[in-house]
């Protein structure tokens, strides 16, 4: 078993832990580091397509905010969370994408006058929608059977 702390190891935001065990690789949360340039978030040490699934502890953006970016970059596995967490994530991720798009548009309008290069949003509403389609809601304290021998207890 290998545990790699990828986020929130030097501050509170940006929670992300990668666990490799029983031939599987998964993330526990994939959150946005808040209060800094969004493009400076911790990169993953593996390609998103090499991650089997994601387990979400709760819906806060510092635990879920990079899931649309994960989907945009090729992750196609399942994202497991309790049903209320899935519902909240749908709202929060779409809202975050809207903010990303609005801020990029604003920076581009402002930067155009100064001759700055255009910026792209970190992710779009379409990316948030793609991430939301990967969610699988589970009952609180239910056993999630991923594959043999991987089983997890839902606690979010």
Would you name each region that the model predicts?
Residues 3, 29, 58-59, 89:
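Divalent metal-coordination and catalytic microenvironments
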Residues 4, 26, 55, 80, ...:
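Hydrophobic/aromatic beta-strand patches that form the interior of the parallel beta-sheet core
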Residues 8, 30-31, 83-84, 138-141:
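Fold-independent oxyanion-binding glycine-rich loops
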Residues 90-135:
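Acidic/polar short surface loop at catalytic or gating sites that assists cofactor/ion binding
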Residues 144-156:
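Single conserved hydrophobic/aromatic residue that forms the stacking wall/gate
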Residues 37-88, 94:
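Active-site metal-binding motif and surrounding structural segment of the metallo-beta-lactamase
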Residues 1-2, 125, 136-138, 147:
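Short Pro/Gly-enriched beta-strand edge/turn motifs at strand-loop
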Residues 1-49, 53:
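Conserved beta-strand hairpin/beta-sheet module of binuclear metal-dependent hydrolase folds
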